[in-house]
Structure formats: structure tokens, C-alpha cells
């Protein structure tokens, strides 16, 4: 199971600037500062997987911050408790108290103003069944306005880590969870006069498509399709309690893609939230449903690194200069070779190439004789590394022509097609494979050359 990072929505007010530390291997120290009525400052000391220590800090130091040190790596934070409320000279609510709990059963001091341990304001608890906190996010200006956390689930494998952003919106309805996929191919959004009532997602997983449906389908719906090189970057939503309904539900959705395209459905009204994880793409949804979509959350995964384009190298054709020049181009590899012989040498060649999942047949070069053709077929995992051959000047043919060809792969050699006579040649480059052919031909094959790329795999 890959690591899944669960991002819990922050508690507190909406003032200050948003910040997000993302995730680390663990937390080593926490520093908290305060004034007479609120938490004004936090500082976190994280440890990365390679042991490097990273420090982040937010807010403003008024009084000397207090320190809480964990016995890293044997101890970690599993819960954060606190309070938030409105205070004098603050336009929105702010965090007034914090307590950190650890896997060793320890508690930090009660940070923030209090009277003999008594606190005021709205209490909150952030925990997830003893799971480890590996990062923080929130809002701050001259104080700590809001605080949220990342929990880690699962164990690290070769699979890339996935971020699960908690569902936001209403609290009613049935819980649903599509899980994470390779990507989202298309989505359909249904609505009535005041709510998002239906969601249909078409996901991709291992080259196959899977469709998940939620809510109640309506006549009014909008389909939004993504291009193969496009992904959903973020979802902005509003939620409210429409007048004629008793539940808080999602009222609008705006999907934004990596190409800058957007798709809007619904009616904006109520509170707003955004599902987004910087530098990552959306790969799945979860939420709550009833007669409408009550709440919505999402999964985010790393953006795949594009496969670098490997420049192809064209090796000059060897042989005579007669006939017309030809060039099959560049492919992923060679699948089949057809060679036709004439009375004095090679009269005809044709190549079948691999391009992605497709087979592409090259043009005929030369002229097929009554002797027909012989073929050399490559197996899965086999690729061409070189060509050996001979060319010579033949009576009745104006310029030299190819007399014989023999093909070498990473596994074997073909039988020679033709006779060993004339000038010998070899085409190929160490550490490269052949991905295309070119040359010159008339009624016979006068010359042949190859295009090669570095060997990166055997497919």
C-alpha cells in the first residue's frame, strides 16, 4: 500500500495568509508564542526522509516562544487540541490555545492564554485514530488564524504517495469513496434549481476505464472531457442550505485543468472551499450523497514526469547513389523485415515498425521479383542493434547496389539475405538500437542507412 496523506481542513478563522508546509517524515520540535489573548506565533522543525532538518515559522513573536521537543524518531504527534474565538482588535476568529499529544502518551504544555488551565472559545480536536502527523497547514498574519494537519496512512512502496483531502460541505448523506486512479478522463455534473444533484466520473486505471456515479441523475447535466495530456488541477465549490431543503449541500462546482480550462455548474452561494494540492493532479473523488451531493473531497497524486524525448541519430546510408532517396522516419522499434532478392542482389526491402501500441508498415523500396520475399520477425523484448552487408557494382546496373543483408538483434542474428561478395559494411552504434531505415532504390536497393536511439528499455 502506498502512503496516503490525509489533509484535514483547518480550524479557526479566515484572516491572514494561507500557508502549507506539505508533508515530511516527521516532526521533531514545535515552538509556540502568544500575547495576552491569542496564539501569535508557531514554528515547526521537520525531518525529511534523508535526515535533513527543515524549519518553518508563521505569525509574529510577541512573547518568548515556548518549546515542545519530541523524542524523534521514536515519538511523534498524534493529535492537536485547541480553541479559537474572536478577540479584541481581530476582524476574524483566531487560535487562542494549543495542546499537542504524542504517541508516547505525553502532552505538551497548554499553549496560549488561560486562567489556571481554563480556556474559552470553540474547542477543536484534530486526530485520526493514533495516526502520525507529518505536516501542518493554516493561516496567519500577526497571529495564528487557523491550523490544520496532514496524517500519514499506509506504508511506503514503489507507488507514488497520494493525498486525500477531506470532504467539505454538509454532514448528512451516505459516505462514498471512489479511491484513487491514474487520472480522470471525463465527468458529468447534474443540477436542479439550487443544488448539485449528480456526479459521474470516468477514471483511467492501467489503461482501462471505470465509471462511478453518485447522487440522483437529472435531465440537466453537463459533460466535461479532458484531453490525454490534461488533468484536473483544482475544484472550487460552494455549499449552502437551500430554502426548501433541510440539508446543507454542494451548490456549485468549478473544475480547473492544467491547460487553464474551467467548467462551472450550479449556483454560487453560501460558503466556499477549494480542493487543491500544489504541484499535484486530481486522481479521485470521495464525499457524501443523498438526493443531492452533500459533500465533496478529492485525492491528489504527483504529476507524472514526462518521458524525455531521446534525439534520434541518423547514420549515413552505405552503397550506391542510384535511384530515388527514401526515408521511413523514426519509430519506437522494428517488428518485421521483408527482403526480396533478384538475380544479382537485394532488389526489395520493406519494414514494419512499432509505434506506441500500433504496428506501422513502411513503404516498399525497390521492386519485388518472382523470387518473392523472405522475412525476419522480432520477438517481444527484442530489438535491432546492427546490420552487416555487402554492396558492389553489378553489370547492367548503373551504380553499386546492395548484394547481401544480415540483421543482428540483442538476442540473435538473422540468416544472410544474399551472397557474401563485394565491399563489406556494418551499420549500428554501440549502446543504441535501430528505429528506422533510409536509403536509395530504383528497381533494386542501391544503399541502406539506419536511424538509431540510445537503448533505454527492451520494449
Curated annotation (Swiss-Prot):
GO MF terms, alphabetically ordered: carbohydrate binding
Disulfide bonds: none
SUPFAM superfamilies: Mannose-binding lectins
Ranges of residues in domain Jacalin-type lectin: 5-153, 162-302, 312-454
SMART domains named among the record's database cross-references: Jacalin (SM00915)
Knockout consequences: Smaller PYK10 complexes.
InterPro entries: Jacalin-like_lectin_dom, Jacalin-like_lectin_dom_plant, Jacalin-like_lectin_dom_sf
Keywords (A to Z) from UniProt: Lectin, Repeat
Tagged with keyword Metal-binding: no
Family as reported in the entry's similarity comment: Belongs to the jacalin lectin family.
Subunit field text: Component of the PYK10 complex, at least composed of PYK10/BGLU23, BGLU21, BGLU22, JAL22, JAL23, PBP1/JAL30, PBP2/JAL31, JAL32, JAL33, JAL34, JAL35, GLL22 and GLL23.
General function of this protein: Polymerizer-type lectin that may facilitate the correct polymerization and activation of BGLU23/PYK10 upon tissue damage.
Protein's name in the database: Jacalin-related lectin 23
Top-level taxonomy: Eukaryota, Viridiplantae, Streptophyta, Embryophyta, Tracheophyta
